[in-house]
Amino acid sequence: AEGKAAGPLDKLKGSTLDKDLLHDVSGSVNPGSVLAILGPSGAGKTTLLNMLTLEKKGGVPQGHIRVDGAPFTLHKYNETAASVEQFDTLWASLTVKDHLVHAVRLYQPQLDAAARDAAIQDLIKSVGLEDQQDVKAGNEFMRGLSGGNKRRLSIAVALAKRPSVLFLDEPTSGVDSASAVMIMSFLKKIAEARSIIIVCTIHQPPASVFAGFDNCMVLSMGRVAYFGKADSMGEYFASIGNTPPPDTNIAEFVLDLVNTDFTPE
């Protein structure tokens, strides 16, 4: 359904010269919510995310993407969306605050000094880096932020753009389980507080991370095996004869299921 301010996808397809990579992928996302795109390796998660972010790779796109009912063009993307890549692209020698000073100056040049400082502190607070704001990002040669805090900083830099839609590629990849839970927790809070759409790909979420999703789309061989409320996924698969065992990780159960049993009809 195309509700106001929803981000609908209508029968998206992606193809190369050899084969179709996605088949009639449809759905919608509302502001203030987090959509997780799940699927085993090769299911089409990266291809779908590339299409949503208008990346010209992974084949020839077909279909429609709309935001607020309007076509999601490159101009619209630059105006309303931001992306966070799987691997952080930070300046090792700059502090958390330095990164956000540059980001706010770039994306919000109209702000005066006082408003700019307030925006920077709001971003730092929104990702929980208040006590790390003077720490350098660091790298393998320079001590700095932990992997989880680097991911938080990358998200804060993207939020400086004040997007209506935020895309993230594997935001919990490469961080420990505690950091993964915290990242998904504050993403959910950010979506609600700023009334933005957050769409992320996730490979194999533990139950504690899965609990942070509002909605999820499960892909298998480029097709949608499930799209709906995350907390209704187990019930749906039970209704079609695949009842999850008690106390199981629903995401893990479903990913194992679609990896071996889901076939297109």
Predicted regions located by residue number:
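Conserved catalytic motifs of ABC-family nucleotide-binding domains
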Residues: 162
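Conserved ABC ATPase "signature" region
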Residues: 101, 115-135
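The feature captures the beta-strand-to-loop junction immediately N-terminal to the Walker
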Residues: 38-41
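Catalytic Walker B motif of ABC-type/P-loop ATPase nucleotide-binding domains
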Residues: 166-170
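Conserved ABC transporter NBD signature motif
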Residues: 27-30, 53-54, 60-79, 140
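Hydrophobic anchor residue at the start of the ABC signature
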Residues: 155, 183
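ABC ATPase C-loop
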Residues: 158-159
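Q-loop/switch helix immediately C-terminal to the Walker
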Residues: 80-83, 87, 92-109, 119
